[in-house]
């Protein structure tokens, strides 16, 4: 049964239209009630990114938590992984990140974490949805039991120290010129500070948030500004985070972009050499490049694939005992340290390899030649074209045409009203032809719905 509010990464939509103060308050009430276990004073940690609507949602959630007797601990602008870490570290009952990640300022969202710092399971989110429809009149606290709200002091320093401790104490980034792009988002203070404290020469862009410019022409989804700055400053490396800093892309010293697949390859090879992999393989999604899979096989590692979404990567990692996984988009999960994707920590693991090998980033990060990959999106206003018999036949035929030389992935987005069609293989012309044909068929089916 399709869910009304929760997608693949919490609740997300246009601020004050989909993500309203009323919805935010009700989500806080439902979550607060659900996680009230034991007789202790209940607490919720709340972080946010820098978009204008985050204030509105934050205050609405404070009201919701307070109304059911839960204290709200306010972090202000902080990366998603910092919220996850601090939720667990501060023994809170629940954590909240107010963010729409890489989306523009018009959107916002709510990500929820349990007391262990992990994102909530589908089952728990479904319980919250059920509670949203049931109402809370009988669950509201008495006046003497209402929750309080308070700002947390020193949270930024705690996260920076946490990130630094993922490296050996003897490692210094001295001698490296690093350009870091914080997307005018949640990491605009912590990322530059952490890199500077580790000894790097830091040049920062995307560190002037105004409520409207998050992800606008900067960050991991718009790396052109970082590419330009790396070349201009003759930097050793560029690090691009997204709006809530749970994903990262790298730019090498030549200005070439290094995606999450290449980054996972570097870390996997390094951890294998050091004996740090908990299993002889890593976890990625169906969207990761075939070249990554072939590279891992060449060094004796396997690639387990999941549905798209870092939560599904993490669920498979936890159930099967992996400690490294991620997505091509730059969500890298290092479960020895983190309970969710952490762009800064992933970048630090790469920098550790660069320092150890004493080679340029371009040499360190080019582990494999990516298979030609074509990704298209078809906007769907209504209907379910993937359930159309003609679309199913076309997909089956396309897979037979690719045979063993490639892959085809067709899926509905969990965050937008689009169907994504991805094809990859050794023959780029064939892949492009197949993807374009499928997009036309899906679009035609959607129009006929």
Curated annotation (Swiss-Prot):
**Keyword Phosphoprotein found:** yes
Q: Which residues carry this modification: Phosphoserine?
A: 101
- The Enzyme Commission number assigned here is 5.4.2.10
Q: Which InterPro entries match?
A: A-D-PHexomutase_a/b/a-I, A-D-PHexomutase_a/b/a-I/II/III, A-D-PHexomutase_a/b/a-II, A-D-PHexomutase_a/b/a-III, A-D-PHexomutase_C, A-D-PHexomutase_C_sf, Alpha-D-phosphohexomutase_SF, GlmM_bact
Q: State the reactions this protein catalyses.
A: alpha-D-glucosamine 1-phosphate = D-glucosamine 6-phosphate
- Active-site residues, record numbering mapped to chain: 101
Alphabetical keyword list: Isomerase, Magnesium, Metal-binding, Phosphoprotein
- State where Mg(2+) binds: 101, 242, 244, 246
Instruction: Using the UniProt record, name the top-level EC class of this enzyme in a single word.
Output: isomerase
Q: Which GO terms describe its cellular component?
A: cytosol
What single Pfam family name could you report for this chain, choosing any that match? Answer: PGM_PMM_I
Tell me one GO biological process term: UDP-N-acetylglucosamine biosynthetic process
**Is Isomerase set as a keyword in this record?**
yes
Q: Which domain of life is it from?
A: Bacteria
**Cofactors named for this entry:** Mg(2+)
User: How does the cofactor bind to this protein, according to its record?
Assistant: Binds 1 Mg(2+) ion per subunit.
Q: GO molecular function: any one?
A: magnesium ion binding
**Modified after translation how?**
Activated by phosphorylation.
The UniProt entry's sequence similarity note says: Belongs to the phosphohexose mutase family.
State the protein's purpose: Catalyzes the conversion of glucosamine-6-phosphate to glucosamine-1-phosphate.
Q: What is this protein called in UniProt?
A: Phosphoglucosamine mutase
Organism per entry: Methylocella silvestris (strain DSM 15510 / CIP 108128 / LMG 27833 / NCIMB 13906 / BL2)
């Amino acid at each position: 049964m399709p869910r009304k509010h929760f997608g693949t990464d919490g609740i997300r939509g246009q601020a004050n239209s989909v993500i309203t103060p009323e919805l935010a308050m009700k989500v806080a009430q439902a979550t607060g009630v659900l996680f009230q276990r034991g007789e202790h004073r209940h607490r919720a940690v709340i972080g946010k990114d820098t978009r204008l609507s985050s204030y509105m949602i934050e205050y609405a959630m404070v009201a919701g938590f307070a109304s059911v007797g839960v204290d709200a601990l306010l972090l202000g602008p902080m990366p998603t992984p910092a919220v996850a870490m601090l939720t667990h570290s501060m023994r809170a009952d629940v954590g909240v990140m107010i963010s729409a990640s890489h989306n523009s300022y018009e959107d916002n969202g709510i990500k929820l974490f349990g007391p262990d710092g992990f994102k909530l399971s589908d089952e728990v989110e479904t319980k919250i949805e059920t509670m949203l429809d049931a109402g809370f009149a009988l669950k509201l606290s008495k006046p003497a039991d209402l929750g309080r709200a308070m700002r947390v002091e020193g949270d930024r320093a705690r996260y920076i120290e946490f990130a630094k401790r993922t490296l050996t104490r003897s490692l210094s980034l001295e001698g490296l010129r690093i350009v870091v792009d914080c997307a005018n988002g949640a990491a605009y203070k912590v990322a530059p500070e952490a890199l500077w404290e580790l000894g790097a020469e830091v040049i920062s862009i995307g560190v002037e948030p105004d409520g409207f410019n998050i992800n606008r022409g900067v960050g991991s989804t718009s790396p052109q500004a970082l590419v330009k700055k790396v070349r201009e400053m003759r930097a050793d490396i560029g690090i691009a985070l997204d709006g809530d800093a749970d994903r990262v892309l790298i730019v090498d010293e030549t200005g070439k972009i290094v995606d999450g697949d290449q980054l996972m390859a570097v870390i996997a090879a390094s951890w294998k050499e050091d004996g740090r992999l908990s299993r002889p393989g890593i976890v990625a999604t169906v969207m990761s490049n075939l070249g990554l899979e072939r590279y891992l096989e060449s060094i004796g590692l396997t690639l387990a694939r999941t549905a798209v979404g870092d939560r599904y990567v993490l669920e498979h990692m936890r159930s099967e005992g992996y400690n490294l996984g991620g997505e091509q988009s730059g969500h890298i999960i290092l479960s020895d340290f983190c309970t969710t994707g952490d762009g800064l920590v992933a970048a630090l693991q790469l920098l550790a390899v660069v320092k150890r090998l004493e080679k340029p980033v371009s040499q360190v990060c080019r582990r494999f030649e990516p298979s030609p990959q074509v990704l298209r999106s078809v906007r769907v206003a209504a209907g379910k074209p993937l359930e159309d018999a003609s679309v199913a036949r076309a997909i089956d035929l396309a897979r037979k045409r690719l045979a063993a030389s490639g892959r085809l992935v067709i899926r509905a987005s969990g965050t937008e009203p689009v169907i994504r069609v991805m094809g990859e293989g050794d023959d780029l012309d064939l892949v492009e032809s197949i993807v374009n044909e499928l997009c036309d068929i899906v679009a035609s089916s959607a129009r006929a719905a």
